[in-house]
Design a protein with these regions (language model features):
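Active-site neighborhood of phospho(di)ester-bond hydrolases with catalytic His/Asp-centered motifs
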Residues: 164-166, 190-195, 224-230, 320-323, ...
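N-terminal secretory signal peptides and thylakoid transit peptides that target proteins
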Residues: 1-20
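Short acidic, glycine-rich surface-loop motifs adjacent to enzyme active sites
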Residues: 197, 311-332
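A short C-terminal boundary segment appended to hydrolase-like catalytic domains
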Residues: 404-432
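N-terminal active-site segment of His-dependent metallophosphoesterases
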Residues: 53, 60-68, 73-79, 84-102, ...
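C-terminal segment of N-terminal export signals and the immediately downstream linker at the start
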Residues: 26-67
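Extended active-site neighborhood of metal-dependent phosphoesterases/phosphodiesterases
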Residues: 57, 121-151, 204-314, 341-345, ...
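Short, flexible loop/turn segments at beta-strand junctions in immunoglobulin-like
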Residues: 111-116
């Protein structure tokens, strides 16, 4: 992890923290029997401290909702102000069990009740918050981000597009080059297809490599969609990744634990997000009995069947599935992911469960990663769907995947990141 670049907070926060009071402190000291005699106690946070450690990260935009997360430098509370004009006017908070949020490293909020294919504006608000006792607490004036905008997705959009980067493994120069190319192509969303980092040991690692890898608002208006990779499950902080990369809201509580599985429409494209889990079986000694993916994949299969039956998915001209570990490998000796030897080249257990559903419902393309080398597999008589696999973390083998679709065709292009040469392009006709 030594190749992670340091975070220049001074330069960054000079541009992101606006509307900050210089000395005002908002103090809440509720009256009650327990706090008598404590009214003058002080627990004031330092007002001159910069509380925000990243620009907003727009994520998981659907027809009716969106989520925003941002990183912190100090324990804080916060919210998102939003509306259909830059004047905003509404507030979203990530409240739970009657309590507004109070976090040390990341804040997030989900905006709901939105309309499809509609432009919205938002900004984040962050106030450092401190407790001395249960009733003696104080907050600073909020720090506000700039006002940003996004457009909800929906089936009525005339076109749809996406950009895929994968296996960045905390290689910040590669991430920045991906983002630079995405800025030129202007896709509807960026899909980060797993192995964002090699492992996760603390919040700072996530802040540097995911929340703010470019020292710019790279995901403030173009949403990031996260598909987990096997390395995204490793390390003591892996279970906290959802603080920064928020999970989707599931319609059926039975599938609540499938936080990163989702299906949505962006114009003519139906996107299916799947989680292939780890690259070794649950009983592999490397996991020390900490892996439990077999029932997780079975639950995903039940979810996938329901997702593909949804009218807006079933009627899509194009259906694209995204997963980190490939579901197919042309090498008959490739590691299938269910043996003790080394690590999986592809995920045969997932393929056995999901490929029949791909066949039945007409999934045309699986977008995968993991192998650190580009490949494309055309459909065959035994497999009706194509598969593209992205490259690796180093510039020499990194590549980006871009897709644009309208009512006539869906075109997929893969580009080498170092010299921008084209590795190939493929077109797909509407399935319905």
């Amino acid at each position: 992890m030594g190749n992670c670049e340091g975070f220049n907070r001074r330069a960054f926060l000079g541009s992101v923290a606006v509307g900050v009071g210089s000395s005002a402190i908002l103090t809440s000291n509720a009256q009650g029997q327990e706090n008598k005699g404590q009214e003058n106690a002080s627990a004031k946070p330092e007002q001159t401290q910069q509380f925000v450690a990243s620009y907003p990260i727009l994520q998981n935009v659907t027809e009716t909702s969106a989520s925003i997360a941002w990183a912190l430098n100090t324990p804080s509370t916060g919210w998102v102000e939003w509306g259909t004009t830059p004047a905003l006017g509404k507030i979203a908070r990530n409240s739970e069990f009657g309590l507004n949020p109070f976090e040390e490293d990341f804040l997030s909020a989900r905006i709901s009740g939105l309309a499809p294919n509609t432009k919205y504006y938002y900004r984040t608000a962050t106030a450092a918050f401190s407790y001395r006792t249960a009733y003696d607490k104080s907050a600073t004036e909020p720090q506000y981000s700039d006002v940003y905008s996004f457009t909800t997705c929906g089936p009525n959009a005339k076109s749809g597009s996406f950009f895929v980067m994968n296996d960045t493994h905390n290689t910040i120069p590669t991430i920045r080059e991906h983002v630079k190319l995405a800025d030129e192509l202007k896709p509807d969303f960026i899909l980060w297809n797993g192995d964002l980092c090699s492992f996760y040991m603390d919040a700072q690692h996530i802040k540097e490599n995911i929340a703010n890898p470019t020292n710019s608002p790279y995901a403030a208006e173009r949403p990031i969609i996260f598909v987990p990779g096997n390395h995204d499950r490793r390390g003591s902080w892996a279970r906290n990744l959802k603080k920064c990369l928020t999970t989707w809201e599931q319609d059926d509580p039975k599938f609540y634990s499938l936080g990163y599985n989702y299906a949505f429409r962006q114009g003519p494209i139906a996107a299916i997000l799947l989680d292939t889990g780890e690259d070794k079986p649950d009983w592999h000694p490397a996991w020390s009995e900490m892996a439990n993916y077999e029932p997780y994949r079975e639950l995903q299969t039940a979810w996938l069947m329901k997702a593909l039956e949804r009218p807006e998915i079933k009627s899509a001209p194009y259906i694209v599935a995204f997963c980190h570990i490939p579901l197919y490998d042309k090498n008959p000796k490739a590691n299938p992911g269910n043996i003790l030897d080394r690590w999986a080249s592809f995920q045969w257990p997932c393929c056995q469960m999901w490929s029949p559903l791909f066949e039945k419902y007409g999934v045309q393309l699986a977008v995968a990663a993991h192998q650190h080398r580009f490949s494309y597999a055309e459909p065959t008589k035994d497999r009706s769907w194509a598969q593209i696999v992205g490259g690796g973390p180093e510039m020499a083998n990194a590549c980006s995947i871009y897709c644009y679709a309208d009512e006539n065709e869906m075109k997929l292009t893969c580009t080498k990141l170092d010299d921008k040469s084209e590795l190939g392009s493929w077109t797909y006709k509407p399935r319905v």
